[in-house]
Amino acid sequence: MDKEKSCGAIVFRKVKNNIEVLIIKHKNGGHWSFPKGHVEGDETEHETARREILEETGIEVSFVTGFREPVTYSPKQNVIKDVVYFLAEALNYDFVIQEEEISQVRWININDADKYLTYNNDKGLIFSARTALRRM
């Protein structure tokens, strides 16, 4: 069994009295999810997440301390993938899309995220993010 490790984040911004999250639509599979990618070399989890968010969307982030949500799943036969997600506030809002992998990037209200996200794991992450943001 092969193991893979990726890191990413639920990226948010505050707009008036609302919170919006950043979602991406992948060209491969057409699913909506959060920015993430494989750990390279001796990168830390945060370094990987920061690099992947910037590469895929052009967004710089600041991580929320204390939020770390691991997810494990099997994307294909004989592969187990561990993904660590963080919660991060966007420092800029203009997209620069990684066109090789991403077809769309969008800000959506956090309360509408369940309608867009393809996978149940991501819907669970939104619940955790909402809970953490309420405590801030």
Where are these regions (language model features)?
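Short, acidic/hydrophobic/Gly-rich beta-strand patch recurrent on exposed beta strands
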Residues: 22-25
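C-terminal alpha-helix
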Residues: 128-136
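Surface-exposed, flexible loop/turn segments at secondary-structure boundaries
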Residues: 17, 29, 113
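Anionic group-transfer/hydrolysis microenvironments
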Residues: 10, 27, 111
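Short small-residue beta-strand/loop micro-motif enriched in glycine and branched aliphatics
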Residues: 31-34
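Unchanged
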Residues: 37-127
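Conserved N-terminal beta-strand and adjoining loop/helix that marks the start
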Residues: 1-20
